[in-house]
Amino acid sequence: MATSILGEEPRFGTTPLAMLAATCNKIGNTSPLSSLPESSAFAKGGFHPWKRSSSSCSLGSSLGGFAVATSRASGALTGGTATANSAFCLASTSPTSSAFSSDYSGLFSSASGVSPQESAGQSAFISKVHASAEGLYPRVGMAHPYESWYKSGFHSDVSGGASAWWDVHAAGPSTWLEVQNTQGALHSGAAAHGQLGAYSPDFSSLTHSAFSSTGASHLLPGGQHLLTQDAFKPVLPSYPDSGGPMLSGAAGTGAGGTGRSARRYSGRATCDCPNCQEAERLGPAGASLRRKGLHSCHIPGCGKVYGKTSHLKAHLRWHTGERPFVCNWLFCGKRFTRSDELQRHLRTHTGEKRFACPVCNKRFMRSDHLSKHIKTHNGGGGGGKKGSDSDTDASNLETPRSESPELIMEGVRPGKDSGNDS
């Protein structure tokens, strides 16, 4: 047997790789008595990585790491007639040998001089051993931290293992964002980009930055993926679709409504006074009420009528006691119901006297004071009307008083609230 062994290839019994393989084989052996002949015979035979063994390696109970080991035939231990051959196998080693597993892991894929048939057989054998080894540890998703690197030649799936949060490459098809679906995500991103581009060009940079990051989004766990196409659906409504009917409806209203009443009363009533509510209730039959343009006070016992809704609102403030107009003169701060009352009050601060007597050229701040003065010249003649006209000219045109003859209904006493001075 020694002659046949010496006649073969050069010996590698003294190399560190052979010593490591012998140690691994010694630990993997079940009989402690056969370890010494095995190591001595292996030292004589050498380590031949290009030959294949006829027996497989036994798998121990502790799997600290994987190393390259050699297996001897059982006949070489007793008879000594069979030649010693070596092959690749995965043997269980001590935890200290796991440091050498990554160094010699390249021999799985870069062994020189291996025929296609032998390489196919070796890969099938290794995949079977690896599947049985992973079955012992169903709780661990990966047998080694760098398993995805040195297992480039074959792939095995752990059926009972739960993938950890860092196990990105082993994610199943149940995850909603995968690396393989990058093209689909980019396609959906382009569709959303087209929809947003039709609305406004300001969203183009947003969609580009959001969907261009999907290539790197697989590095995040499943709970951290926040930018999806569904997230944009409830946020951005379809403005172009709803904008078309709105514009067309507005154009149709402008073209169809020729009269002022058609534009004004096309929707709800613009005023809540009794006259407007009655016209709204009658519909087309209330066109006569709309043409009059009269807005009456709804307070019982008042019955005043105004030609503009703004005038009616100013009158209603007198009922409610609201005083929105404030004097901004220093240390004054008085509040008034109407703007003309505020203007008349400001003349008391400035000392302006707008109304002059046509007889004696005496000037007055208020028109009613001028009216009383003219009565002294005429002996109580028709000076009152002149003072009333002057007061009307002095008042603000935005909120005219209700003493206008054409807006007063019968039975309403004129000048009811005209003589109050604030």
Swiss-Prot record:
GO cellular component, one term: nucleus
Keyword terms, alphabetized: DNA-binding, Metal-binding, Nucleus, Repeat, Transcription, Transcription regulation, Zinc, Zinc-finger
Start-end of Basic and acidic residues biased regions: 413-422
Motif (9aaTAD): 163-171
Protein location: Nucleus
Identification of the protein by name: Transcription factor Sp9
Annotated InterPro entries: Znf_C2H2_sf (IPR036236), Znf_C2H2_type (IPR013087)
Example GO BP: embryonic limb morphogenesis
Gene3D superfamilies: Classic Zinc Finger
Entry's Gene Ontology molecular function annotations: DNA binding; zinc ion binding
Function: Transcription factor which plays a key role in limb development. Positively regulates FGF8 expression in the apical ectodermal ridge (AER) and contributes to limb outgrowth in embryos.
Chain positions of all zinc fingers (C2H2-type): 295-319, 325-349, 355-377
SMART domains named in the record: ZnF_C2H2 (SM00355)
Gene label: sp9
Family stated for the protein in its record: Belongs to the Sp1 C2H2-type zinc-finger protein family.
Source species: Xenopus tropicalis
Ranges where the record places region Disordered: 372-422
